[in-house]
Amino acid sequence: MGWTVTVDTDKCTGDGECVDVCPVEVYELQDGKAVPVNEEECLGCESCVEVCEAGAITVEEN
């Protein structure tokens, strides 16, 4: 089982909260937006979804 991590770049404000909260470093900021560069490491904990005030992140089980 894996997880699909999606960031809506139109909603993303680039505050980096998801980068800071993710326990397995799925995200990094690129050009002021969060990018799930290590999606295969995602644990599905949804901490990133909880801290994203813009509602830009979705995490779905494959």
Curated annotation (Swiss-Prot):
Organism this protein belongs to: Nitratidesulfovibrio vulgaris (strain DSM 19637 / Miyazaki F) (Desulfovibrio vulgaris)
Transmembrane region(s): none
Disulphide bridges: none
UniProt binding sites for [4Fe-4S] cluster: C22, C42, C45, C48
N-terminal signal peptide: none
Function as written in the Swiss-Prot or TrEMBL entry: Ferredoxins are iron-sulfur proteins that transfer electrons in a wide variety of metabolic reactions. This ferredoxin serves as a carrier for pyruvate dehydrogenase.
Cofactor binding remark: Binds 1 [3Fe-4S] cluster.
Cofactors that this protein relies on: [3Fe-4S] cluster; [4Fe-4S] cluster
Keywords (A to Z) from UniProt: 3Fe-4S, 4Fe-4S, Electron transport, Iron, Iron-sulfur, Metal-binding, Repeat, Transport
4Fe-4S ferredoxin-type domain location: 3-32, 33-62
MF GO annotations: 3 iron, 4 sulfur cluster binding; 4 iron, 4 sulfur cluster binding; metal ion binding
Protein name (record): Ferredoxin-1
Oligomer and partners: Homodimer.
Binding-site list for [3Fe-4S] cluster: C12, C18, C52
